[in-house]
Amino acid sequence: MVFYKYSGSGNDFLIVQSFKKKDFSNLAKQVCHRHEGFGADGLVVVLPSKDYDYEWDFYNSDGSKAGMCGNASRCVGLFAYQHAIAPKEHVFLAGKREISIRIEEPNIIESNLGNYKILDVIPALRCEKFFTNDSVLENIPTFYLIDTGVPHLVGFVKNKEGLNSLNTLELRALRHEFNANINIAFIENKETIFLQTYERGVEDFTLACGTGMAAVFIAARIFYNTPKKAALIPKSNESLELSLKNDGIFYKGAVRYIGMSVLGMRVFENGCF
C-alpha cells in the first residue's frame, strides 16, 4: 500500500487511494504516529465517486473522522491532478460538502471551502473558569464559535506577543468544553492576521489549520470589519490568502509534495487494514 505525503502550510498529510469504503481509523492512528508510523497530521483516503471527480474520507492523527480539513483539501487537489484522477479545475466531495479546486501554478492551489455558519457568540464570563492566573485569554472579551466545515472557537488578543504565551492546558479545556478547535488570533492590520490553532483530533498546536484560518478570517470580517480579502499567517509563518465571495470562502496557498512511503507488513499483522 503506497502513501503519498504532502504539506500545506506546514500541515502534513498522508494520502492513499482505495476502491472500497471502509473504516481506516486504526490505520490512521498507526501511520500518522510521529515515532512509530510515517508521521502526519491526518490521513486522506481518496475514493471513487459517481457524481464527482472523487470523494474522500478524512481521519485525524488520533483516528477520529472529520468531514473537512482546509489544508488537506488543497493537498488532495494537487495529488489528484498529479495522479491523473482529476483536471486542474475540479470538484470533489468531502463528507456532505462539495469542494472546488483550482491549480493556478505548479504548487499554488486554491480551494473553495464553501459557506460558514456562526454558531454562537460567547462572552468571556463563560470561559473564565478555564483560565489560569495572568492568562493571556483573560483580555479577550468575546469568543466566536464558527462552523467552516468543522467547529472552531475564535478569540482575538490585543498584541502579537500574546500568541507566544498560550497555555496548552487552557486551550485543551476549551476544546473539550465546546467540542471545537481553538484559534487565538491577532489582527496586525486590516489585511494581515496572525493566529495559532489548537486542533481537535491532533490534541495539540498544529503548524496550520485551513478551516481554522477560515473561521478566524470570517470572525475578523464580521466582528472587526476587516476586508473581504486578507493574508492569514499561522504558526508555520507561511502566508495564505483568504477571500470571501458569494459562493464561499476561498483559500489559496502553496502545497509541497514531500515523498512516498510503502506500508510494511507489521500494520497488516496488527489488523489495521
Curated annotation (Swiss-Prot):
Pathway: Amino-acid biosynthesis; L-lysine biosynthesis via DAP pathway; DL-2,6-diaminopimelate from LL-2,6-diaminopimelate: step 1/1. It is found in: Cytoplasm. GO terms for cellular component: cytosol. It is an enzyme of class 5 (isomerase). It holds the Pfam family DAP_epimerase. It catalyses: (2S,6S)-2,6-diaminopimelate = meso-2,6-diaminopimelate. Its EC number is 5.1.1.7. One of its GO terms (biological process) is lysine biosynthetic process via diaminopimelate. Its main location: cytoplasm. The record marks H152, E199 as: Could be important to modulate the pK values of the two catalytic cysteine residues. Catalyzes the stereoinversion of LL-2,6-diaminopimelate (L,L-DAP) to meso-diaminopimelate (meso-DAP), a precursor of L-lysine and an essential component of the bacterial peptidoglycan. Belongs to the diaminopimelate epimerase family. This is Diaminopimelate epimerase. It comes from Helicobacter pylori (strain HPAG1). The gene is dapF.
